[in-house]
């Protein structure tokens, strides 16, 4: 198998685990690691269902509608994907893309955890050294940015573009250094999306588009 051979070469010749990980992630997002079920619903129908569900959730949660970036009509795919897959933008599948509060809130000695980029380490959400805000402040902040289970967090400062699925059912607020992506997780697998965003292909796009935050 060419992919198995290439992965061994990366490991044996360069001893570079990060490059091996990148190779595996790229293979996964190209649909090369598992046999595809061509009898599944076609990509166009799947995308329509995702977009409809995303809009339904946006309305239900009373989230402000914003103009979405979609693929241009002359879009050229950078690589081949399985025939039952399709290309989309994050805007198309997310019903909200936002970030944490842009001002420093009043901290409390205990209360609701208030996370910043420093609390996302080694692929985990670390609550051991967080600041806290009051329940009242939390209720105010969540009107604009309300992290919930199966949403995705995305770092905006330092090493940008590192995603993390919220895999716990816990209340917390976010600072501006972390972005929040809300998806219809009954239609989009959040863990696959996390892998896609972690892939070298998407990281290159993120790097090219990073101009600063605030």
Indicate residue ranges for each PLM-predicted region.
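A short beta-sheet element
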Residues: 116-117, 135-198
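Short coil/turn segments at secondary-structure boundaries
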Residues: 5, 35-41, 63-73, 103-110, ...
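Specificity-determining recognition surfaces
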Residues: 196-214
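A structural feature that tracks compact, well-ordered secondary-structure segments
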Residues: 23-41, 50-53
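Cys/His-rich finger/ribbon microdomains and the adjacent scaffold used
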Residues: 42, 46-89
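Short, basic/aromatic beta-hairpin or loop at an interaction surface
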Residues: 119-133
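Low-complexity, Lys/Gly-biased intrinsically disordered segments
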Residues: 86-123, 138-142, 160
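Non-catalytic DNA-recognition/assembly elements of restriction-modification systems
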Residues: 1-7, 11-14, 19-27, 32-33, ...
